Amino acid sequence: MQTALLKPKIIAVEPLGDHHAKVVMEPFERGYGHTLGNALRRVLLSSMVGYAPTEVTIAGVVHEYSTIDGVQEDVVNLLLNLKGVVFKLHNRDEVTVSLRKEGEGVVTAADIELPHDVEIINPGHVIASLSAGGKLDMQIKVEQGRGYVPGNVRKFGDESSKVIGRIVLDASFAPVRRVSYAVESARVEQRTDLDKLVMNIETNGVISPEEAIRQSARILVDQLSVFAALEGTESAAEAAAARAPQIDPILLRPVDDLELTVRSANCLKAENIYYIGDLIQRTENELLKTPNLGRKSLNEIKEVLASRGLTLGMKLENWPPAGLEK
């Protein structure tokens, strides 16, 4: 009897327009089309990385309910138009860009001054219309993120740093605009009870529909991998011990193993420095404050440590380890 689950062998991508495609996957076992289609759809809409304007400062504007002389749109509509600009950042998480224009005419996304590693997908997008004598001067902060983040959630954590006139925007980072899926019948040899998953995906151009599917699948695999590795419930202490960095065995050895002079060794023990791990965490200034330990003894300690690849002033996590005797 056949017990192995079928995996899709046919994956077809049919372009339907700019940044719009239909992705077909088959065959799936019965019921898997809806199971995977719904999971992929939710991840595509909520968890993909994108970019959005998050803060704006406009010259002469104190709050979003203002108007600007010579600009046909009020500030609320101007900000709504600005949210429609699709940014793409390369090798950075945030950037502040400028928009300066004056004189009669239409202001588009192409008028935004960009550094070399920032791209605008829709440069023809209209932001505002200026009349004769109109002037628009804006600073726009663009950030990387996931999903939708309301402005009141990400408002200034430190109110003292708030700049008068800085407007915080609701940010829609999601690069996937629309996703729908359908499950149709598929057939393999004599089996006719299989599923075909058809996904219709439209993005804003920051990512292609095919790449969006790949990334969403990776996210699901990553989230579910913890269940595949599940071997039972471990105690909190065991979990913490497993996460703790391993300590170099040389640090657990007593300072006597350094074969220091009697004077230096006695000075260290008087300061409760029993192990090499205790010693390397002390600084030169701290050791020089030790009674009867002078510059000569300090140099001796430094030379002995250097011969073992160690120095003073090192930082150790989880020191001392549990069970270390003093």
Curated annotation (Swiss-Prot):
SUPFAM superfamilies: C-terminal domain of RNA polymerase alpha subunit (SSF47789), Insert subdomain of RNA polymerase alpha subunit (SSF56553), RBP11-like subunits of RNA polymerase (SSF55257). One of its GO terms (biological process) is DNA-templated transcription. Keywords: DNA-directed RNA polymerase, Nucleotidyltransferase, Transcription, Transferase. Residues 1-231 are annotated as: Alpha N-terminal domain (alpha-NTD). SMART domains: RPOLD. Residues 247-326 are annotated as: Alpha C-terminal domain (alpha-CTD). GO terms for cellular component: cytoplasm; DNA-directed RNA polymerase complex. One of its GO terms (molecular function) is DNA-directed RNA polymerase activity. Signal peptide: none annotated. Its EC number is 2.7.7.6. It is an enzyme of class 2 (transferase). It catalyses: RNA(n) + a ribonucleoside 5'-triphosphate = RNA(n+1) + diphosphate. InterPro entries: DNA-dir_RNA_pol_insert, DNA-dir_RNA_pol_RpoA/D/Rpb3, DNA-dir_RpoA, RBP11-like, RNAP_asu_C, RNApol_insert_sf. Homodimer. The RNAP catalytic core consists of 2 alpha, 1 beta, 1 beta' and 1 omega subunit. When a sigma factor is associated with the core the holoenzyme is formed, which can initiate transcription. HAMAP family: RNApol_bact_RpoA (MF_00059). DNA-dependent RNA polymerase catalyzes the transcription of DNA into RNA using the four ribonucleoside triphosphates as substrates. The N-terminal domain is essential for RNAP assembly and basal transcription, whereas the C-terminal domain is involved in interaction with transcriptional regulators and with upstream promoter elements. Belongs to the RNA polymerase alpha chain family. This is DNA-directed RNA polymerase subunit alpha. It comes from Ralstonia nicotianae (strain ATCC BAA-1114 / GMI1000). The lineage of its organism: Bacteria, Pseudomonadati, Pseudomonadota, Betaproteobacteria, Burkholderiales.
